Design a protein with these regions (language model features):
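N-terminal, positively charged nucleic-acid-binding surface of large information/translation enzymes
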Residues: 1-114
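Structured secondary-structure scaffolds
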Residues: 3, 11-12, 57, 80-309
């Protein structure tokens, strides 16, 4: 088990950022971002710091980077009628800010080939959402943010000191960083002959024999991060090591792509989806004070939202 606050996780994320940047898969761009202006102070409002109306489905309560109602993602400035979650009374402006973008468009053909290869194992909702992203045409996606928490950029210069790595570019790497942390800290002590490189058994394509299989379980809002963004990062890393061309999915020594992404639809409560951030749910400690856990296990088993909300 590992946490993304682990110092070695941060070190590896910066390493990945640097490799992708040096290989040309990250590029610097100027983007427009909402910011709040209050009492002479200015604060950028990325992602969940801003809320408004979805530009795709017109649902209220949409976030700065994604709509929970329809699953759409969009550019930050496309959100309609924005307001600050930190200070709803603050004035909202659009300002230019420089960030680094992952060139997802470079991986379009490879990701389409990968998706076609997974058609027989992906569930219909995974196939549909991934196809929607690919059919719209992939475009560069920002992987840094104007925030004061998170992993700092491995770059010098005052212009980058206030930027941090975007949480979803960083968090999906936790599968990979956790394995490397285990190898570094525990593998040799546990007697693995490969020492700190023992993690590679679980992550790289061997010269012969079956490669390790990775299966991810999640809610549907996380599908594109695991079928588009995370595979693109892995493809970029493989290419940065000179092990593979991004047009060839896997070669010996490469980091493996996922075998399956198993995603459920939303579990609903009183007409709305369960949501920790919105405090809409049934909290386990309170439930267990009154009911046996097997009651909940049975209910979730027969009502698991595998095909629809």
């Amino acid at each position: 088990y590992n946490r993304t606050t682990d110092p070695m996780h941060k070190e590896i994320v910066r390493e990945v950022f640097t490799k992708l940047l040096d290989s040309g898969f990250l590029e610097q761009r100027t983007m427009q971002q909402y910011c709040s202006v209050s009492d002479g102070s200015i604060r950028f409002l990325p992602d969940r710091y801003v809320e408004g109306t979805c530009p795709v489905c017109s649902a209220g309560g949409a976030r700065g980077d994604q709509c929970d109602s329809c699953g759409a993602t969009y550019e930050a400035h496309e959100l309609v009628d924005p307001s600050s979650k930190l200070n709803p009374d603050a004035d909202i402006e659009v300002r230019d800010t420089d960030h680094f973008f992952l060139r997802l468009n470079d991986f379009q053909a490879s990701l389409e080939a990968h998706a076609n290869d997974r058609q027989v194992v992906w569930k219909p909702n995974v196939r549909a959402m991934s196809k929607n992203w690919l059919d719209m045409g992939l475009r560069p996606r920002a992987v840094t943010r104007d925030i004061d928490w998170g992993i700092s950029l491995p770059l010098e210069g005052d212009e980058w000191s206030s930027k941090r790595v975007y949480v979803w570019f960083e968090a999906v790497q936790g599968y990979y960083t956790c394995a490397r942390i285990w190898g570094s800290r525990y593998a040799a002590a546990e007697g693995h002959p490969e020492g700190e490189l023992a993690w590679e058994k679980w992550w790289t394509v061997p010269q012969d024999g079956e490669h390790p299989r990775h299966i991810y379980f999640m809610g549907k809002d996380n599908i594109p991060f695991h079928t588009i963004i995370w595979p693109a990062i892995i493809m970029g890393l493989n290419a940065s090591e000179g092990k593979a061309d991004i047009d060839h999915l896997l070669s010996s020594g490469d980091l493996v792509l996922e075998d399956n992404v198993s995603a459920n639809e939303y579990l609903m409560l009183q007409g709305g989806q369960f949501s920790k951030s919105r405090k809409h749910g049934v909290w386990l400690p309170a439930f267990l004070e009154r009911y046996d856990p097997d009651t909940l296990r049975y209910y979730l088993s027969i009502n698991m939202p595998e095909g629809h909300d």
